[in-house]
């Protein structure tokens, strides 16, 4: 009985793999949910699967919508860029860092956390924060001020101009010695104006009847193969055609 079962499993796997294609893998569940929501709103028959009981996730889309799906995700800044946090930057690795290395890692960690925070604002596709903390000489009379530059790419139709003062205040209070005037914010539009634009330009889905016909044909082939290789207890071997003769004799009788 193993041969028919293996054949059926193989046919089902081939049919499933032919229906969809993997877009991204190794995702967190939150990223997978965000991507799935965006794709569904854009008219894509997407799905998410996990190969390892929820540790990582993958997002799939129909073959005929792969290119369109990637365009939609790219316009929405998905999957989200992963930013390191201070805990990861200063995790114990058994090595002793120099004060200069510690300073660089701290500045980088703060900029990464700020970038992650700003990326969570509605309408933001991506955000990057660059921080400059001069290493001032304590014996010098001139002090170089700290500065920060914020770059935000946002979706067209999102009004982030009113949030610029709040963004500058957030960055100022996150960096020691930084003043409000030394924080610059650059806003750049990108992506689509709305999901309605993508929905209107979504490629038409083909009729499902060819797939249903293919599934029916595959099931018929699997049934015929199972019948052919059905075991014959009397002969002690696989007796497919002999089994057919027995069935015909039974009907005639």
Swiss-Prot record:
> Lipid modification S-diacylglycerol cysteine sits where?
19
Tell me what gene encodes this.
hrpB3
- TM segment ranges: none
Q: Which GO terms describe its biological process?
A: protein secretion; symbiont-mediated perturbation of host programmed cell death
Q: What does this protein do?
A: Necessary for both basic pathogenicity and the induction of the hypersensitive response in resistant plants. Could be a part of a specific transport apparatus or a secretion apparatus that is required for pathogenicity. Hrp proteins may form a complex (tunnel/pore) that enables the export of molecules such as virulence and avirulence factors.
Family, similarity comment? Belongs to the YscJ lipoprotein family.
The record ties this protein, via Pfam families, to:
YscJ_FliF
Q: Which UniProt keywords apply?
A: Cell outer membrane, Hypersensitive response elicitation, Lipoprotein, Membrane, Palmitate, Protein transport, Signal, Transport, Virulence
- What protein does this entry describe? Protein hrpB3
- Please give the Gene3D superfamilies that the UniProt record associates with this protein: 3.30.300.30, Hypothetical protein rpa1041
Query: Is Signal one of the keywords UniProt gives this record?
Result: yes
């Amino acid at each position: 009985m193993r041969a028919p079962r293996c054949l059926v499993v193989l046919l089902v796997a081939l049919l499933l793999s032919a229906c969809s294609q993997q877009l991204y893998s190794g995702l967190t569940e939150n990223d997978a949910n965000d991507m799935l929501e965006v794709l569904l709103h854009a008219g894509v028959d997407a799905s998410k699967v996990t190969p390892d009981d929820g540790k990582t996730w993958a997002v799939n889309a129909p073959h005929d919508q792969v290119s369109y799906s990637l365009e939609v995700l790219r316009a929405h800044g998905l999957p989200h860029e992963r930013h390191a946090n201070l805990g990861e930057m200063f995790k114990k690795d058994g090595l002793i860092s120099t004060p200069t290395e510690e300073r660089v890692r701290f500045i980088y960690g703060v900029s990464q956390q700020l970038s992650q925070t700003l990326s969570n604002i509605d309408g933001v596709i991506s955000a990057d924060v660059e921080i400059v903390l001069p290493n001032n000489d304590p014996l010098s009379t001139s002090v170089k001020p700290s500065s920060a530059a914020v770059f935000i790419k946002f979706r067209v139709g999102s009004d982030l101009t009113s949030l610029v003062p709040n963004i500058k205040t957030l960055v100022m209070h996150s960096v020691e010695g930084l003043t409000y005037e030394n924080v610059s914010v650059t806003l750049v539009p990108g992506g689509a104006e709305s999901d309605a634009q993508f929905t209107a330009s979504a490629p038409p889905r083909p009729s499902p009847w060819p797939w249903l016909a293919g599934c029916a044909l595959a099931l018929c082939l699997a049934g015929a193969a199972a019948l052919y290789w059905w075991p014959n207890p009397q002969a002690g071997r696989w007796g497919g055609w002999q089994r057919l003769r027995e069935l015909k004799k039974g009907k005639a009788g």
